[in-house]
């Protein structure tokens, strides 16, 4: 879909450079498609055989109604069971997977690895009825792909409800009685969750308050270092008599006013030692163009 969208876009806007890039991407895409097509080189006896690039090949699947097989034609096999009493691979005459099947004894043997299984006629694949046990034939097939090895079979005992009630302490009558009393009730869990939420909010609030106090202290310390320099600068302007001359409001006036607002609200006597700064603040506040705004303005937090 990406290539179709880009193609429509380039056709609509006539982007020459984009068209060149799109053609290059299309050529690369076609080359990858051709490479993928050459990877699969046909079927052998109903199997789709695909090359691996290292001299071997993969046997991917069958097309005759049997179960799919995934195998390696060079070093070994990896086979699933079939429902027609035959191990896939050797014995059907299609692809040599290193397996040998004896129909008289029901033994499926790996030539490279030796005898892997025995007795596949125990009812799993001969059409007989499965015994009513806790484990299924699917789990046996996963353990032994060519049959069932009696020595490897693990029968999982089926326990009744009384067995689990006696072993599990949370299923006996005492635990149920505790549930009725509210020991593990939903309301108890809700109370715990609400308490945890309240505790988390309290911690966050305390952290925010501590952070705010830290920022205020840092700001006040910055003012203690910067304001003396600002005071000396105002005294240098025309001998300190006409600093920031002019009737129009200047940007530096407004910046100075905003910089002095919060520390003055924190401590009214903070500017007692900076008379020029206090005079500047009063001058800014008395400007006609900005006085109404200053009166409406509320204290901004950090």
Swiss-Prot record:
GO terms for molecular function: structural constituent of eye lens. Signal peptide: none annotated. Sequence repeats lie at residues 45-54, 55-64, 65-74, 75-84. Keywords: Eye lens protein, Repeat. Gene3D superfamilies: 1.20.1050.10. Transmembrane segments: none annotated. Residues 183-302 form the GST C-terminal domain. A motif (Cell attachment site) lies at residues 52-54, 62-64, 72-74, 113-115. Residues 129-166, 177-192 have a biased composition (Basic and acidic residues). Residues 45-84 are annotated as: 4 X approximate tandem repeats of G-G-Y-[AYP]-V-[QK]-[SG]-R-G-D. It comes from the Eukaryota. Residues 68-92, 118-205 are annotated as: Disordered. Pfam families: GST_C_3. Belongs to the GST superfamily. S-crystallins are structural components of squids and octopi eye lens. This is S-crystallin SL4.
